[in-house]
């Protein structure tokens, strides 16, 4: 039987196949450690579950260079934990709060304690996201979200969904969405 860490590693691998993420990308992660442990969201926050999931996410970050943003719970209006340098580089405004298990959630609190120089920001526009336990990360994704199906549908007992974003297609019937020979003929 797979551990929750192994399950998350599988999910991350599936996301990477669908949308290769790198150091230029931002990944939002929403987690209910209660749901992972088989309890109702917000009722049984677990540091141990958070630590296991963080290990997989940190390993993924080390391999890909992707920036991580951990969504807090609704008590903090789903604000996010990020590294200060990433938040500043992206122009995100810091807010004055520190997550704790009962107001922020175990996952965001754990990430806050592990980051080098953590800050909390109110909102972001991430390139991709993973939602473990139906925490509703969509408000932090760039438009247009493209759902990604994983080979597994749960981490522990928590339902898992993923998405990456793509640029909006604009222009109508005469618009072109791929480079053509015509583009090459305009090169000098």
Swiss-Prot record:
It holds the Pfam family DUF436. InterPro entries: Antibiotic_NAT-like, DUF436. It comes from the Bacteria. Signal peptide: none annotated. This is UPF0340 protein BH3766. Belongs to the UPF0340 family.
